[in-house]
Amino acid sequence: MAKEIKFAEDARAAMLRGVDVLADTVKVTLGPKGRNVVLEKSFGSPLITNDGVTIAKEIELEDHFENMGAKLVSEVASKTNDIAGDGTTTATVLTQAIVREGLKNVTAGANPLGIRRGIELATKTAVEELHNISSVVDSKEAIAQVAAVSSGSEKVGQLIADAMEKVGNDGVITIEESKGIETELDVVEGMQFDRGYLSQYMVTDNDKMEAVLENPYILITDKKISNIQDILPLLEQILQQSRPLLIIADDVDGEALPTLVLNKIRGTFNVVAVKAPGFGDRRKAMLEDIAILTGGTVITDDLGLELKDTTIENLGNASKVVVDKDNTTIVEGAGSKEAIDARVHLIKNQIGETTSDFDREKLQERLAKLAGGVAVVKVGAATETELKELKLRIEDALNATRAAVEEGMVSGGGTALVNVIGKVAALEAEGDVATGIKIVVRALEEPIRQIAENAGYEGSVIVDKLKNVDLGIGFNAANGEWVNMVEAGIVDPTKVTRSALQNAASVSALLLTTEAVVADKPEPAAPAPMMDPSMGMGGMM
């Protein structure tokens, strides 16, 4: 296919148009009085949302060059969402501000590489200062504050705080759709580990691409299963019970995997195979954790056990197992409470004895998985459209809360970004590097400016006043008052704010140094076929 190429100013201007289209669409959602965006879906009702990354992913522009600019901003939103789980709209606003100011200076003759160095230096300083002014999130009240700000609902904030209190900060919290109209919290005992199914043909729910096993047997082994004959006697016993099977093994390959998949597809029995979690001695310990949780036995040479001699009595049991491409969650294992408590006590002793930070972290993860359980937030709403929107907000709130627990929190509403301007502006530099620093200083004002404008206030006036008030005081766009942001519960996770700035600066700096853009040349539409003059003319002389 032929290519179309644009250079220098033409290339950057086209990409800026794409950046503006996407950012202008997303930024109307920022802040407590941000609006929603309606997204057309190919089937079903439209999606109404204020989630930045969801909106960004939907935008495709007809012009290839403009679309590349839009996709770069979408990448910023996606990357921020992957790292922190929230802050995608802030990241989009920051990207647009840096790109706009940067391109003005590049067009005026500034050196893009000098500007890039200035942007990187300013961003590094701003991130360091964000960490300096952040505070630790370790109370239920602080967790509820963060979740409430992210979701825009105090009820959701309290719900997530309750969930984290019950399963611990490292516990597993999932979000499901409720059959009723109320949103509620359900906590079930369970364990999750980061291993998914070995074949996508094992899924039972093609929409979610996950396998759900109700009341399954669980085979736990540190051996590799390559020969189906090794487990054939066991499979025949399970077949008589008409129950599904989860296989957790070192690996399942050779003839064994296709044989299991074929029987699954034919409906002979429902089976899912996953690799054992962890490595080396840690893998053995985690398999033992799973065995104790489910009331099973690890089939291992250490105990003199062979796969061909395994019986149903050696298998674990659970009320439900959910497996997707990345994770396996075991819910309500059938292990005895006494055995689980003894295992928890053993792990706690090991945590107290170890001198390695890495080992301590891994032991705490095992403890959380064994004792924490799984919290399920069941989202309810009157309509499907409202349900989808609320579910997205709760997911954002959960991600924001975890980010806050990890790196602390700062004043919300764009206040923290303005608070670090003093340190950034004080950096000593010359020429185009100094210009790059000034670009970031200007961009740091943009989120609060947009929040104010979305709430009906003059952004420039709010920014000027914010620069002259005490640290921690900020503008509450919900009611137009100047308050202590932390006391008012208006806080953002440091990780979210930091990730938004870093990702925005990274992509913007690359875009500013772009000198040529290559895109597919649109093919002309094929001409309509000419009609045969002898057709359709019957009866005429």
Swiss-Prot record:
Query: Known InterPro entries for this protein?
Result: Chaperonin_Cpn60_CS (IPR018370), Cpn60/GroEL (IPR001844), Cpn60/GroEL/TCP-1 (IPR002423), GroEL-like_apical_dom_sf (IPR027409), GROEL-like_equatorial_sf (IPR027413), TCP-1-like_intermed_sf (IPR027410)
Give Gene Ontology CC terms.
Answer: cytoplasm
Q: Which Pfam families match?
A: Cpn60_TCP1
- GO MF entries: ATP binding; ATP-dependent protein folding chaperone; isomerase activity; unfolded protein binding
**Enzyme Commission number:** 5.6.1.7
Q: Which UniProt keywords apply?
A: ATP-binding, Chaperone, Cytoplasm, Isomerase, Nucleotide-binding
Q: Which GO terms describe its biological process?
A: protein refolding
Q: Does the keyword Chaperone apply?
A: yes
- Top-level enzyme category: isomerase
Q: Binding of ATP: at which residues?
A: T29, L30, G31, P32, D86, G87, T88, T89, T90, G413, N476, A477, A478, D492
Broad class of the protein's primary localization: cytoplasm
**Catalysed reactions, as listed in the record:** ATP + H2O + a folded polypeptide = ADP + phosphate + an unfolded polypeptide
**Key word RNA-binding present:** no
What are the subcellular locations of this protein? Cytoplasm
Concerning PANTHER family, the annotation shows: 60 KDA HEAT SHOCK PROTEIN, MITOCHONDRIAL
Name the family. Belongs to the chaperonin (HSP60) family.
Assembly information from the UniProt record: Forms a cylinder of 14 subunits composed of two heptameric rings stacked back-to-back. Interacts with the co-chaperonin GroES.
* Primary role: Together with its co-chaperonin GroES, plays an essential role in assisting protein folding. The GroEL-GroES system forms a nano-cage that allows encapsulation of the non-native substrate proteins and provides a physical environment optimized to promote and accelerate protein folding.
Q: What is this protein called?
A: Chaperonin GroEL
- Species, as recorded: Enterococcus faecalis (strain ATCC 700802 / V583)
Query: In the record, what lineage is assigned to the organism producing the protein?
Result: Bacteria, Bacillati, Bacillota, Bacilli, Lactobacillales
Q: Which gene encodes it?
A: groEL
